[in-house]
């Protein structure tokens, strides 16, 4: 139920999140709070698709031993399996994107917005530690909360 979903409550402005004054303020589901839905590189694409569908997301971080190793997107899965549906049983690492936008948590919102023109998401890092993904929707939610 949305009433008991803290992320929905935050998005609607009913509860306040801790503010850091950096890109962490824009991350919709912080990884450090175990809020990030992820897959592993050896999970099958069917698992990734189910998690994407159930969460209503278009991309998921691929984590290996606590380290961000890639991003799997709906588009990447489609491109990989189109014409070969049996490939839904292939490991995520075969279809994931290994090259993607990464920004340090201290990067400016201007840099983030510029990057989101190229790619619909950016991975935020604190040094080598994965903080979370920021999507265009997260930026819109952040801007709405500024009003």
PLM region spans:
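Tandem CBS (Cystathionine beta-synthase) repeat/Bateman regulatory domains
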Residues: 1-147
């Amino acid at each position: 139920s949305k009433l008991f979903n803290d992320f929905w409550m935050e998005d609607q402005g009913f509860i306040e999140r801790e503010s850091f004054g950096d890109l962490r303020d824009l991350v919709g589901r912080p990884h450090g709070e175990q809020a990030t839905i992820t897959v592993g590189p050896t999970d099958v694409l069917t698992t990734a698709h189910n998690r994407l569908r159930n969460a209503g997301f278009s991309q998921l971080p691929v984590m290996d031993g606590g380290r961000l190793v890639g991003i799997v997107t709906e588009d990447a899965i489609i491109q990989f399996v189109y014409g070969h549906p049996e490939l839904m049983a292939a490991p995520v690492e075969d279809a994931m994107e290994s090259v993607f936008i990464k920004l340090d948590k201290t990067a400016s919102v201007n840099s983030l917005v510029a990057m989101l023109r190229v790619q619909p998401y950016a991975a935020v890092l604190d040094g080598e530690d994965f903080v979370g993904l920021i999507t265009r929707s997260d930026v819109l939610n952040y801007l709405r909360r500024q009003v």
